Amino acid sequence: ASLHVRHVGGLLRALGTSIWGFHIHNMMTDKENCSEMKLLMHMCCGPCSCYPLKKLRTDGIEPTGYFFNPNIHPYKEWEERLQNARKFAELSEMDFIADEAYSLRDFLKKALPAEGMRKGRCQMCYAWRLEQTAKYASEHAFDAFTSTLFYSIYQQHELMRAVAEDFAASYGVSFYYEDFRIGWQDGIDLSKEMDLYRQSYCGCVFSEEERYSRSLRKLQRKENKEKKRLRLMA
């Protein structure tokens, strides 16, 4: 039978060992007992929750969704993603908890100083959300926590994992790790079937600027190229 492994003192990571792509820390259990695990699943959005929930349920785990994303801006975008996460939870018949505080000012206070750091605002953003998830899990008698952030092929996966493991140790709660990226296309297909809102940027105003400024520069280069071609034809 497959085992879920909770390793002690980072031994397996130190050895570079990965067992079936997932780890749970600080104890050992067999797969049947996973159905009794009380797991808090941080949800970055509805679409990114599709495959993780499917995989967890396949493994006999029934998580509780937890929406805490102070990085999402502007307000209408945050509200859209919150309601979309709630819609997903309702359609999936999954328990759902949401922190409905909109924290633009707090985010900017944290993000602007982080711009000058080596790993920058992304590390700050991961840490803020994963720490709050670990804290909530610890305070509300959850056995473990995870995040749909580990589904995204665009996030800094190993950095997030290290951050989550640190907070698991700090708050005395297990971190359930699984590389959900293997189900990337499956999650996309499921989100479309459920008619979920599929956002075009990570969430923060900085990522929005980066995405659309790149698009604008690309469009400008295309226009300049066309103007040059027309001048040569004249």
Describe the residue ranges of each PLM region.
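Ala/Thr-enriched low-complexity intrinsically disordered regions
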Residues: 1, 14-17, 29
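Low-complexity, intrinsically disordered regions enriched in charged/polar residues
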Residues: 2-5, 182
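Short hydrophobic alpha-helical segments enriched in small aliphatic residues
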Residues: 5-8, 24
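Nucleotide-activated chemistry modules centered on ATP-dependent adenylation/adenylyltransferase
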Residues: 29-234
